[in-house]
Structure formats: C-alpha cells, structure tokens
Regions:
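Conserved cytochrome P450 K-helix E-x-x-R motif and the immediately C-terminal K′/meander segment
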Residues: 284-319
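Cytochrome P450
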Residues: 180-184, 271-282, 338-341, 415-419
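Cytochrome P450 proximal C-terminal region
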Residues: 374-503
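Cytochrome P450 heme-binding Cys-pocket and its upstream "meander" loop
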Residues: 295, 334-371
Length: 503
C-alpha cells in the first residue's frame, strides 16, 4: 500500500511527454489533474455517467488505465483471479516499453515477491504466512496495548487545550503499533521510516526503497538471532520458509498499512465525530457511535480511495467494456462503494463495502486495522470528551493524490485535562513476567503455538520498541517527560509531517 503513495502526481513533470504513443488521442480523464484533487467524487460521478462501470483514465506520467467505478464490476474483477492477475509481468504497456520513464507508477508497481503482486500458489503461500503470523496477535492484548499507547500520546497535549490531531495522534498511534508488532528496535525503525519518507515524498524513491529494505533486513537478521513474540519472528519461523527478500516485501506491505492507510481511517472518522450531528450527543464517546463513524468512512470516503492494478490475462468483456489482455485496470474503492449506495441505500447498514478489497487479495489485516482505529478513537473521546474542531470544516485541507484520501490536519480545541500521574506498565495482559520474549515454536504444522483451553492463541504483544524510552531499572514503564521523549518522537513526527505535507 505504501508504494502507491504517489507524491509526485501533482507536479508538472507527471504529465505525459508530447507525442507519447501510448496516450495519443485516448480522451482519458487525467487523475493527476488539479480538478481531481479538489473534488475526486465529482470526477468519479462524471466518469460513471459518461462511461458506465469502467472508464479510461491516466495516472501520473500519462500511464493509461481503466478505472472501475461500478460496485458489481469491481466485485467480479476481484473475485476472478483466473482472469484478472495482480502480477505486473502481465502489464502489456510495461512489457512493450510504452510507459514514460518519469512515471512513478511503473517504478513501484513492478514485479516483486509481495503478496499483492503475485497470483496462484505463490500468492497462497505468502498470504498464508501473513495471515498465520498476524492471526497470532490476541485482540485483547492488542486492545490494551493500543489504549496505553493512546494514553501516552494524549498525555503530550491534553493539558494544552488545543492540538493538531493528525500529526500528534491519528498518524502516530498506528506507527507506534506497527513498530511494536514488528518487534522493531528504535534505531532500526527510525531508519526504516526515513527510507519510507524518501520513497513517499518522491525526493529519492529508489534510494528510499533501498534504505527501508536494508533496515528490514537488519531487523530480520536480529530476529533470526533473537526471536521473540512478534510478527517478524513469526514470519521467519513460518513453514512457508520465506526468503529474506520475501520477508522484506511482506513487512513493507504491513508497514504501509500503518504509516499510510490507518491515519486516514482514524482521522476521517474523528472528523465525522466532531462535525457531523449524526454522531454528536451525550454518548459521543460510546463504542457504537465510533463503530458507526468507521462504517460511514469505509463506505463513503475510504482512506485507500483507489487500489493497485489488475491485468486481464486474456481478452475479456466485463461491465459492457472490451478489455485486451494486459490492460491496466484500477479499482476505485471510493467510487464503487458510492455506486453501491446509489443502487441500494440500505447497504450502508452492513459491512459489504469494498474498503478492504474482496476476493483472494482482500486486506489480510482488516480486523486488526479496525480494532486499532476504534480503540484509538474511543480512548481519545473518553479522555477528552469536549473535543471541538478549531475552525470551519470547509477550511480543512485534504490529500490530493490518487490513492490515499484523508484530511492533512485536524486542529481541535478543548478544556485542558490534567494527565494522570501514574505510570503505565507495558507488559501485555495475560503474559507472565519472562514469557514475553519466548520465540514461536517452529514445529507446529501451521506455524502457531497451542494456547491453553479457553484462551486465544499467543495472547502476547511484544515489548514496546518505539515507546518513550524508560531509564534503566524502570521495568519498561513509560517516561512521558524529558529530553529523551523529544528525541524519540522527532524522527516519527518529522517523517509524518514530511509525507503529509508532500501530499
């Protein structure tokens, strides 16, 4: 997902070169144009009215694609892997050398051993490793960890009476959680985020990719020597026997969810809770309203607005359109969801949205993503119940790229709240002292350890690698004050500020 953050798409250099044979006379809608950034839903609506469920568009660099804006057509594409491949080796224009060298998309949507870019048995093997490894995280333990992470972040601004919640909360919660779940030491995570930042903001995409991959390889080497109860160790020990390159690619994909899509989900739901009267009232902090707000966002304004490309492996007809083998087809999750609501308004009462995809390539971490978002929102509204938007909702600025949707900043005001004086231990619930760093058992058939009867598998979350550092002998407790805290957060805040502004 991170690879799809095309921060160069709004620059003049993203336009196709004059006379490019791949784009002459296509009449395609340029999704890199300012109009799309200002109001993407107006563009989706116009495309649907003019072309039906599939419409010709151009990505950055003039890359041609068909954009799917119809719900039923999108479902059919995602559920027909025998016809629609995710492997860029099937991309005809790429294979024929027709794509601009300046384009961001072909450089990142390249053949690579990542679960979102492969099909068939290779896809099943990689996805099985991801699902088995992420499935070992106990939801109760994860909930407790997110609550404590949220408390620590809220402590940093709760006494000020005002805050900007995207950079200081909505984006930091998932980043800290991902570092925790990876079992990633601070120094490695700092370098990893610097690499991802260079990739995302377009300053050095290839160099940033290398830096991030090198940091992950160092993490993998560390976990081979010192396995622990974390996703990295579980992926390494999985019976699928992933290569180091495959391990790097799967971790990059998971990291993309935390640094990219999750801030948009949390931020957009919080915007609704603060500005939409349907979500106001005395029970504002209640879990039902939070869940309703998340459903609203996932249906009407999903954080991943458009997803990566599909390629028909043979000529085919779908949605009233003839596609040639190797055509690039991009599914607009935002447009297809709204198409479904136009046809059947009652759908919004269920979770049949496509915000997490569908079919064999549906997001494997959707349940954890939703849990992190809901807990982060509940905790914030519980700690600061009188949050109010500082300014008019019409003044909020939005990301203007093709793939990711969300507000750039979310300024709020509130009555100052005194932060609790007690420290919070980071030992996960249900884990006895000394058990936290036990490695996974490599001999289990499906890569999982047996859990006691009545308990969830592996109810452990690794120690907080990216927490605010604690002094020696503190027992892993938070230290929310002092110079170390400022140093700890500087890299994360710098990274997040950098990529948000680049959008």
């Amino acid at each position: 997902v991170t690879q799809l953050y095309d921060s160069s798409a709004q620059r003049p250099g993203a336009l196709p070169p004059p006379g490019c044979p791949a784009h002459a006379g296509t009449g395609a809608e340029p999704l890199h144009a300012p109009e799309f950034g200002r109001d993407p839903f107006a563009v989706y609506r116009r495309l649907r009215e003019a072309h039906g469920p599939l419409a010709p568009v151009e990505l950055d660099g003039g890359v041609p694609a068909m954009l799917c804006v119809g719900y039923e057509t999108a479902l059919e594409i995602m559920r027909r892997p025998e016809t629609f491949s995710k492997d860029p080796r099937n991309w005809r224009d790429r294979n024929e050398g027709l794509l601009s060298e300046s384009s961001f998309a072909p450089r990142v949507l390249r053949p690579r051993p990542q679960v979102d870019f492969v099909d068939g048995e290779e896809h099943r093997r990689l996805r099985g490793a991801i699902e088995d490894s992420t499935g070992r995280i106990d939801p109760g333990a994860l909930r407790t960890y997110v609550e404590r992470t949220a408390d620590t972040l809220i402590d940093q601004f709760c006494e000020a009476g005002e805050a900007e919640l995207i950079g200081s909360y909505c984006a930091l919660v998932p980043v800290l959680v991902m570092g925790q779940l990876f079992g990633c030491p601070q120094e490695i995570m700092d370098r990893l985020l610097r690499g991802v930042a260079a990739f995302i903001d377009g300053s050095d995409p290839l160099g940033g990719d290398r830096v991030a991959a090198e940091a992950l390889r160092e993490l993998i080497d560390l976990k081979r020597r010192e396995p622990a109860a974390d996703i990295t160790s579980w992926l390494i020990a999985h019976p699928a026997r992933l290569t180091d390159e495959e391990l790097v690619e799967q971790l990059l994909l998971l990291l993309g969810m935390g640094t990219g899509v999750m801030p948009g989900l949390i931020g957009s739901a919080l915007r609704l809770l603060l500005t939409d009267e349907r979500f106001s009232g005395d029970v504002m902090g209640g879990s039902m309203l939070v869940e309703d707000a998340l459903d609203e966002v996932l249906w009407t304004d999903p954080p991943l607005a458009n997803m990566g490309l599909y390629f028909p492996v043979h000529d085919t007809n779908i949605g009233g359109t003839r596609l040639r083998a190797g055509d690039a087809v991009m599914i607009s999750l935002a447009a297809t969801n709204r198409d479904a609501l136009l046809r059947s308004p009652h759908k919004q009462g269920n979770r049949a949205h496509l915000a997490f995809g569908a079919g064999p390539h549906a997001c494997p971490g959707r349940s954890s993503a939703r849990l992190i978002a809901s807990v982060a929102l509940e905790k914030l509204l519980d700690r600061i119940p009188d949050l109010a938007l500082a300014g008019e909702v019409e003044q909020l600025k939005w990301l203007s790229g093709v793939f990711v949707r969300g507000v750039i900043t979310l300024p709020v005001r509130f009555a100052p709240v005194i932060k609790p004086g007690s420290r919070r231990t980071m030992v996960p619930p249900g884990v006895r002292p000394g058990e936290r760093d036990q490695p996974p058992h490599p001999d289990q058939r499906d890569g999982r350890q047996d859990a006691p009867q009545g308990a969830s598998p592996l109810p452990s979350v690794p120690s907080l690698s990216l927490s605010l550092p604690a002094p020696p002998g503190s027992g892993g407790e938070f230290q929310p004050e002092g110079e170390d805290r400022q140093k700890q957060q500087s890299a994360l805040l710098g990274f997040l500020t950098r990529w948000r502004r680049s959008r």
